[in-house]
């Protein structure tokens, strides 16, 4: 049955772990720390960006260029989950590595197009309504962000190998080293007078490539073990047409698995752009966008950490029908993460981080504190959603995940449109839309799993 996935997979190898709170926590905490430290890089370089000549508005332009970069990169967003499901043998690993390279090359080329004439003016000045000086910052951030996005794709392969060997601690160590380098640059560059969006991008890119090299180094022995045990020949002669066909079919199988997940990731990545379009049409739009970006910069690391429950769900699927132990674990973990997020509502921390570090004006600080308070429930919603999406991945039903992610964008834009019509303040619009969309996503994935399960039984 689908719920007894931990014993043996379809190729006969043991690839799932038995549930216990201690074992799950030892696997999840490094993932949580990795996600948190990975996402905290952006608030760090926010200090470099906001101290440039454009102040906090420079962060708005920088964030919009990065948003488009991540939206394009998200078309490969299903690759990590694909690797965790399919890259558990030597042949599967090599097929995954080839697929990852093909998608990286195609998407990096695609990333350059909106940053070049004539599309750049249509995107930044037209759709996003950015003034010329901010449009120029967003354009250059997107164009030179090609190097940063490349590091993410390159990291996919060794990171998947570590996750599949339950070595999330080593993946976390690489990310911690990345955050330390980014922190060092965030301190050093402003002291050298190197501030503004361009230097913020330099700090991010340097840390990302450093993380890739460390992750690759940690994964080397596990890759060697995979290669020595592979069952499907890869480096065979050109005359071996059967082997070539089998290699092609493996890549094609993984591509078919990753496309629905990646399309869904693209839909999710498009959501910040949708928020920017709606909030940009509210009263005092520049202030509202700035508040949105500085507060989502705090909420995203914790929300992303909660979403890592997807990987935990793949490693620890249900052992029997009605097994809800991981669901309860996800709820508890999300509640703890939400409590940590609420620390940014306290006056002392809020005044320092938003007022001093991110240069938010004193009269706008209560907006930032209010937004963070409204995000308090979001980590729990994210963790529950991630648990259900992980089950869909284990059952090799990426269409269920995609259904949820389509629902996310529909719910997000619908909520934004309604709140804009009602005259809701810009920063409240974004938080309400994100929370509502997350709930709708969870319901949609769960419903899709139920429907697809019934079809399989027929």
What are these regions (language model features)?
Residues 16-40, 142, 146, 169-173, ...:
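Hydrophobic faces of transmembrane alpha-helices in multi-pass small-molecule transporters and flippases
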Residues 2-29, 134-136, 197-205, 213-269, ...:
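Interhelical loop/hinge segments that connect adjacent transmembrane helices in multipass membrane
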Residues 3, 39-60, 125-129, 190-194, ...:
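Helix-terminus/linker motif at the lipid-water interface of multi-pass membrane proteins
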Residues 94, 161-187, 198, 319-332, ...:
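Alpha-helical transmembrane segments of multi-pass membrane transporters/permeases
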Residues 141, 173-224, 230, 234, ...:
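Hydrophobic alpha-helical transmembrane segments
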Residues 131-158, 298, 302, 361-388:
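Alpha-helical transmembrane segments of multi-pass membrane proteins
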Residues 109-139, 339-369:
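Short membrane-interface helical motifs at transmembrane helix boundaries
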Residues 59-111, 155-164, 291-344, 385-393, ...:
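Small-residue-rich hydrophobic transmembrane alpha-helices
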């Amino acid at each position: 049955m689908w719920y007894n996935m931990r014993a043996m997979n379809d190729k006969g190898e043991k690839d799932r772990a038995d549930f216990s709170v201690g074992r799950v926590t030892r696997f999840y905490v490094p993932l949580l720390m990795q996600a948190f430290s990975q996402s905290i890089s952006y608030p760090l370089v926010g200090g470099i960006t906001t101290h440039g000549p454009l102040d906090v508005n420079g962060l708005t332009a920088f964030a919009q260029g990065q948003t488009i970069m991540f939206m394009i990169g998200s078309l490969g967003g299903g690759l990590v989950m694909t690797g965790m499901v399919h890259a558990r043998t030597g042949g599967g690993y090599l097929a995954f590595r080839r697929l990852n390279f093909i998608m990286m090359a195609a998407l990096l080329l695609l990333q350059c197009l909106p940053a070049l004439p004539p599309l750049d003016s249509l995107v930044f000045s037209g759709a996003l309504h950015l003034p010329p000086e901010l449009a120029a910052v967003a354009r250059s951030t997107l164009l030179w962000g090609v190097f940063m996005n490349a590091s993410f794709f390159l990291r996919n392969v060794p990171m998947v190998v570590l996750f599949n060997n339950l070595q999330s601690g080593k993946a976390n160590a690489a990310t911690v080293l990345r955050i330390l380098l980014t922190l060092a640059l965030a301190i050093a560059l402003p002291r050298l007078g190197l501030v503004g969006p361009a230097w913020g991008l330099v700090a991010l890119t340097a840390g990302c490539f450093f993380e890739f090299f460390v992750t690759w180094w940690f994964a080397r022995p596990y890759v060697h073990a995979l290669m020595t045990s592979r069952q499907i020949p890869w480096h065979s002669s050109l005359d071996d047409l059967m082997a070539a066909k089998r290699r092609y079919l493996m890549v094609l199988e993984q591509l078919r698995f990753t496309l629905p997940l990646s399309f869904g990731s693209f839909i999710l990545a498009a959501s910040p752009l949708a928020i920017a379009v709606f909030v940009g049409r509210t009263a005092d739009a520049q202030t509202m966008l700035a508040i949105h970006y500085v507060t989502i910069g705090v909420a995203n690391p914790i929300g992303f950490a909660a979403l890592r429950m997807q990987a935990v769900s793949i490693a620890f699927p249900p052992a029997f029908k009605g097994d809800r132990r991981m669901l309860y674990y996800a709820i508890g973990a999300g509640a703890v993460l939400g409590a940590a997020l609420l620390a940014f509502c306290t006056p002392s921390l809020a005044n320092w981080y938003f007022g001093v570090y991110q240069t938010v004006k004193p009269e706008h600080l209560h907006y930032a504190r209010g937004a963070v308070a409204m995000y308090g429930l979001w980590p729990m919603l994210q963790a529950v959603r991630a648990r259900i999406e992980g089950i869909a991945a284990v059952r090799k039903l990426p269409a269920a995940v995609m259904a949820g992610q389509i629902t996310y964008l529909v719910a997000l834009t619908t909520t934004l449109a309604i709140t804009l019509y009602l005259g809701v303040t810009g920063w409240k619009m974004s938080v309400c839309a994100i929370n509502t969309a997350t709930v709708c996503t969870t319901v949609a994935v769960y419903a899709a799993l139920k429907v697809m399960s019934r079809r399989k039984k027929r």
